[in-house]
Structures are given as structure tokens and as C-alpha cells.
Amino acid sequence: MANVALIGCTGMVGAHILTSLIANPAVTRIDTISRRTPQAASSAPQAKLTTIVSTDTSKWASELSSLTPIPSIFISALGTTRAAAGSFENQYKLDHDLNLEMAKAARDAGTKVYVLISSSGADVKSNFAYTRMKGEIEEGVKALGFERTVILRPGLIAGQREESRPAEAVARFFAGALGKVHSSLKDGWAQESDVIGKAAVNAGLKALNGEVPAGSEKVWYLYGSDIIQHGKE
């Protein structure tokens, strides 16, 4: 049985992570920390889900540190866009700095398993600022030395976003069209947000139980086909 803390619970993937956690009988308690109340909170059992809502993200780490019982799994689907943040500098503060601050707080509290929703192409040596930032987040988390770290690298995230992203909307349309012809035409480069959410939960629980592939005992990467496999179990 697992106690899980989640940040990024109001985003497209994070919302599906939360609904998967609520539905999973292996999860006994969920704590979310967010700037607004997650939609799923209205129908979730109060005994299972506790929501901490604060627009002051500087207090999030202390909120996490004070959780009892200590979360055995910490999941981050936290992220924003340059447009929403106003600049890449502001995006970096949230996506990179806050993510690592929260990861350190979870590690220091005694959390065993850390699950990160990253991105395909994440690489500290990337010429692109976004994928370089994602790579820096991954490296920062791995350096913290959790008992087990799980990193999901989805491709295009298919699903309905609250905010408008025209270029992504076009790509999601084509992904959906190809998926209707045959799933194999889409699964390698695009994954549905609900599938990613369920994969994050299933992989986190498996990591907690030591059920990870050989060679991935400390850090377990899940790519497109892995996400599909674990998200459809």
C-alpha cells in the first residue's frame, strides 16, 4: 500500500495521474499541492485525498515536508509554457527550480520513489532551451539519490488542454487521425494523456515494490512504447 504526494495535478497529464491514483486500491492516501483545487477533488473520497492549495509556491516545500504519513511515492507532473510564464526565465523558475526544490524536500522527508513526467529529447547538451531544461531537471533529480527514480519521456501528449496551443492542436489532430487507422502509427511519437497518467502511477507502484527491469534498479526510464505498455495495464 502506498501514500502518494503529487504536484502538477491540475495539468493535462497531472489530472489523469490524480484520477488514476484515486481509482487505484493500492494507493491509500493522496496529498496534492497546487495553486488551484484539482477538478477530481469534488468527487474523491475525503479519507483518501487531501488537497493543499496555495498560490505562494515558496511555501510548497515546507508543506510537503510536514506531510504525515511521509509519502512513499512523490510524483511531479509540474510544468508550464514560456507563453504562460511570460518568459523562459520565469518558466525555468517553475519547471526547473521549483521541481528540484520539491524533489529535495521529498528526498529529505524520506520518500523512497520519485516519478517525473519529463519529455522526449530531454538532454542537458541540447541546443534547444526547452529540452535542455528538461535534461537539467532529470540530472538534478537523479543526483538527489532517491531509492528509485522513475522518469517518463512521452512524445507529443495527445488530449485536451485547457490553454490554447495551436501548433500542438494540429499535431494532436493528426495523431488522432493516425491512431484511428492503426495505433502503431501514433504510439511511437504520441501518447494519450490518460495513458501517460496511468503509466506514471503503475510504474511508481512497481518501483516501490522493486518490480523494475534489470539494470534500472536506481533509475528507470519509460519511453513511448513503455508508456503505452504500462498505461494500458
Swiss-Prot record:
- Report the membrane topology from the UniProt record: Peripheral membrane protein
Q: Which UniProt keywords apply?
A: Membrane, Mitochondrion, Mitochondrion outer membrane, Transit peptide
Q: What is its main location?
A: mitochondrion
Q: Which GO terms describe its biological process?
A: import into nucleus
Describe the family membership recorded for this protein in Swiss-Prot or TrEMBL. Answer: Belongs to the FMP52 family.
Among PANTHER family, the record links this protein to: OXIDOREDUCTASE HTATIP2
- How is this protein named in the record? Protein fmp52, mitochondrial
Source organism per entry reads Emericella nidulans (strain FGSC A4 / ATCC 38163 / CBS 112.46 / NRRL 194 / M139) (Aspergillus nidulans)
What lineage, starting at the top, does this entry show?
Eukaryota, Fungi, Dikarya, Ascomycota, Pezizomycotina
Q: Which gene encodes it?
A: fmp52
